[in-house]
């Protein structure tokens, strides 16, 4: 039985996390799908499809849709694979979201999963995208970090919203993020009890920002950005190190960060400060859709 939801209840969230954990342990994967519809372009669109068998959640499809080019992740319990559950979930997703203005669908998976399931791409008629992403992890060892008198890291509030949006838009506009999407990210991060939006001030001016997602079993850093004129001066690593040290005192989680493989500089920075590669996230497009764009 498949149930479609635009938002998960606490019980469903708990079941989903249990299934994700089970699949990760079995497959050797690391990436947690996003279990909120907070950033989706239409909050009414079904974003979670749950497949139950005898009262147990054995399949999950999640939809990440900050714009009309949506990303889908499908997870099936190891004991229930090759029974058509993934297909059934995707068919349900197509049917339930047909009335919403979706332009394209991209599947998210991990390199290790594709290596262990080499027929998956062909069986589903998919083609691998050139863009890939590396997820890196770090243990709870703190950094030796001296205070710098003219630098300050603060938990942001709404008075900084415009400055943060402007900085993020300049940093990430090449990733085809519209200003509207960036504004939504910032506004929701400020509201979300599971997020912490930090800013780095230099002489009182916002020169950096980073969001920490606390909703999974790691402190997940994303959207770390330094303003253009201040790059290459060590401020990115200072902000990351400061946040690691602070969060070690606040919770008992380890750390994760994701970076596009094309962003060689950022990847090098994270590796230099002790983050270690966990997995490569791969994006798969439907063949027809990809061909029609070319």
What positions do the PLM features span?
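C-terminal "cap" of GNAT-fold acetyltransferases
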Residues: 130-160, 253, 258-264, 279-294
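Short amphipathic alpha-helix that is part of the acyltransferase structural core
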Residues: 1-35, 146-177
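A short, internal acetyl-CoA/4′-phosphopantetheine-binding micro-motif in the GNAT/acyltransferase core
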Residues: 73-83, 224-232, 260
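Active-site rim helix/loop that mediates acceptor-substrate recognition in acyltransferases
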Residues: 24-53, 175-211
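Conserved hydrophobic beta-strand within the GNAT/NAT acetyltransferase core sheet
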Residues: 72-74, 105-109, 221, 255-259
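Acyl-donor-binding surface of acyltransferase catalytic domains
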Residues: 67, 78-149, 284-286
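Conserved acetyl-CoA-binding loop-helix of GNAT-fold acetyltransferases
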Residues: 82-95, 226, 232-249, 267-272
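Conserved donor-binding loop and adjoining core beta-sheet/short helix segment
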Residues: 24, 32-97, 110-111, 210-219
